Design a protein with these regions (language model features):
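Active-site-adjacent pocket-lining segments in enzyme domains
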Residues: 32-36, 41-51, 56-117
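Flexible gly/pro-rich beta->alpha loop and the following alpha-helix that scaffold active-site loops
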Residues: 2-49
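Short intrinsically disordered, low-complexity coil segments enriched in acidic
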Residues: 1-4, 103-105
Length: 117
């Protein structure tokens, strides 16, 4: 097994060659905006094991609420979920007000959910 840190210059080739992809937390909107530059990202990760933590989870979701951002935002929609990470019992009404067709994921710190597409 080889661990490779993604680079902007080789990102698409790195995704194509990878079986497992981990998307870290951090600056949510910067991460989403950078990944959106890769128009085929959803197709590139299809069939791969992909894990997202915090901002990475927001990126994969359809809708998310981040207390740092302070309002609802759209993820890439790779997972048909609406999510709050670092959930502490607040802001559920934000998710309840939109897209009743999506599963709601309220993830406390160190809590994870596994989905299969």
């Amino acid at each position: 097994m080889e661990y490779v840190l993604a680079t902007r210059d080789n990102f698409i080739e790195q995704i194509k060659k990878s079986d497992i992809i981990y998307i870290h937390g951090g600056e949510t909107m910067n991460l989403i905006n950078e990944i959106k530059k890769c128009a085929d990202f959803a197709l590139l990760v299809k069939g791969k094991v992909i894990a997202g933590e915090s901002a990475g989870s927001y990126l994969l979701s359809s809708i998310f609420y981040s207390k740092t951002i302070g309002h609802l935002e759209e993820g890439l929609g790779i997972l048909p979920i609406k999510v709050i990470c670092h959930f502490a019992g607040l802001h559920v009404e934000k998710l309840d007000s939109i897209r009743g067709d999506l599963e709601k994921a309220l993830l406390k710190d160190y809590q994870y959910k596994v989905y299969s597409l």
